[in-house]
Amino acid sequence: MIKGGGAALLQEKIVASVSRAEIIVVNRTKLVDQLGVFPLPVEVVPFGWQVVFNQLESLHGNPDLRLNKGKPLVTDQGNYIIDCHFRKIKNPKLLEHQLNMIPGVVENGLFINLCTKMIVADGEQLTVRDRK
């Protein structure tokens, strides 16, 4: 699962990691067959963000610095978000490890094994999915 479109991925991941249950509610348009359809946010410290950007390019992440009114978007923790367009993420665990090994990366939007239940809204219908 990829989260962090609202730029609070560090906070969300901290809460998810200490929760007994992580229940996510989504619209069916967020469901994909392959991770990478939507950009993967990577939270980075402002100092040296360009170096991290270059490292993300070397991982074929096709990165974009997320902007707000022409300036880097700043998270509640004072960091920047770089959105990576990997197209297909075949091995999320490996990618998460590679991202976390880059000096300057604070967190990434891969929420691996943190969601225990997902509620999917499709018009008037709700579907509950438990983690497999």
Q: What residue ranges belong to the model's regions?
A:
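Conserved phosphate- and dinucleotide-binding cores of soluble alpha/beta proteins
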Residues: M1-K132
